Amino acid sequence: MTLATTHESKAAVPAFAWVSIALLLLALQASILFAMGRVPICTCGYVKLWHGVVNSSENSQHIADWYSFSHVLHGFLFYGLTFLLFARLPLLPLSWPARLIVAMLIEGAWEIVENSPFIIERYRAGTISLDYFGDSIVNSVSDNLAMVLGFLAARVLPVWVTVMIGLAFEIMLALHIRDNLTLNILMLIHPIEAVKQWQSGPPII
């Protein structure tokens, strides 16, 4: 979302330092998940670049799946949110790399919470995700990287393009897997039986 990148202050920290911080955050996320008992890779014994079957035990176990689009959308939203909150602070304006680190912290924290026993059981009880037992570490880290991709894309794309892509993702996911970021949040916070029944149907497209 190119809200006004020309007004952003230039990062005083070298690019290598930002990359190092980002890698450390990913390593920390992976370490915490490992300490929580999450499996490094799919228990099937291999890693796929893409797994497109949502209602299966391998969903959220490989590098990318249909929910990766939702994590790209996280990046869109985090770019806009951090721009509004931090880009023009009078005392401490944050450069875009610093705001990306903030976004990675938020995404990483959510990945850890999402893989807690409480949230896993919440998904299984309140949604159609009966085969969901949490993410593999490689999938969780990949989700954070998908968010980074969305953040970087939002930085260079016009706002209207970012919004249109986000809407296209939501519509595509709703029609193909009967789920998306909006429905995911709704069913996690306040499950609705009618929505759950609708989600159990076959792909619309």
UniProtKB/Swiss-Prot annotation:
Main location: membrane
InterPro entries reported in the protein's UniProt record: DUF2585
Cellular component aspect of the GO annotation: plasma membrane
Subcellular location: Cell membrane
Membrane-protein topology: Multi-pass membrane protein
Keywords: Cell membrane, Membrane, Transmembrane, Transmembrane helix
Residue ranges of the TM segments: 16-36, 66-86, 157-177
Keyword Protein biosynthesis: no
Pfam families in the cross-refs: DUF2585
NCBIfam families: PRK00944.1
Family: Belongs to the UPF0314 family.
Protein name: UPF0314 protein bll0647
Taxonomic source organism: Bradyrhizobium diazoefficiens (strain JCM 10833 / BCRC 13528 / IAM 13628 / NBRC 14792 / USDA 110)
